[in-house]
């Protein structure tokens, strides 16, 4: 009888969880981690970070719906030009949140030390012995210059929260570099205090397909792939898609015309995340001009930003925020580092939106034209890089240790240049030379294309040891068309595999 009652309780609990999470697409690991932390018997200090618009706030509010004791969101610095008034604005907003959630009998705080003392009083008054979740969203925005915010926040955790077993403090931020430097890698009062870090990544192609299905928006894999090439799997962006409209129509409404949904998103994005938005935009604008990227020295020369601490911090912040990545090009000394743009949305914005934002039908009018052809190729390559695990599974090498690289050899008067955008260098002595081709039908390899591919294979072979074998691997939307020149291909990965 006890077992039967327990079974009923478990079924009710499971049904409640399923209902609570029914609105969340993917994020299974993150939800499981939050549940584990919520049910622990110790104080928890959790930092959740990731690119702006990636769904951090939505995840917390849905996963812990009905279980948050206090929540507050920092005020965006966008449109706040007066540095002196920013601290006052943040403190006022925090005080009003305290009042709205039950604080009584206290005047507005003048310092952050006072503000967190008021939060302690509120939590003590609401304490019934159960878990108390304190959720502070966009925490980095609250740390305005010379405000004394960080020492007060340190004191709040070290002096009060850490001694209460039922406290779960969750902080979020789009300014990933702030979260990492001030919380994760803090060398002061918050050193080693985080009990958990959760990095929220953009949706995969599979998760985007799940979202569109959940929203009852009918889209083919081909169009979902194109939407990913534009919006990069950012949930907030694709939430603007409307059913009954094509990919082209939706993209035009979201990005182009007189009243696009994401008007001035590029500038607002950088202003909300970075302390030095103009320097960050300079770097991103430069990286958008060359797919293979630039070295630190090239970036400094082209942007006018001096080599040293300032540029290093800007590059580090962009890398940590997943706008750019750095890699050591194949065949170059390991000390040679290239930085390349990997944010799909920024790439598309700089390539097309800035110059054509008023053209309400830009995508619909140019989808099959040469204007978008070059972008299709570059953007598809980025999507492939973002789905390396799916590609490795399709190649049945998921368990084989490997490294990734790209190879770019500039030609001269004596020899042609060679560019390989993805190499999978495996520990089993096989190198997958990956060619990524976006096409609306099976890709046909011509005689000229076969000659070019053989040249690349021979050029790469000259740099490898005799033990290593090269597998030409075609990654395409609909596969390679069978023909007299397709025999050169060793392995294939199609669009279907990217959705796995």
Say what each PLM segment does.
Residues 1-370, 472:
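Phosphate-binding site recognition
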Residues 329-500:
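A cross-kingdom feature that marks ATP-driven nucleic-acid transaction machinery
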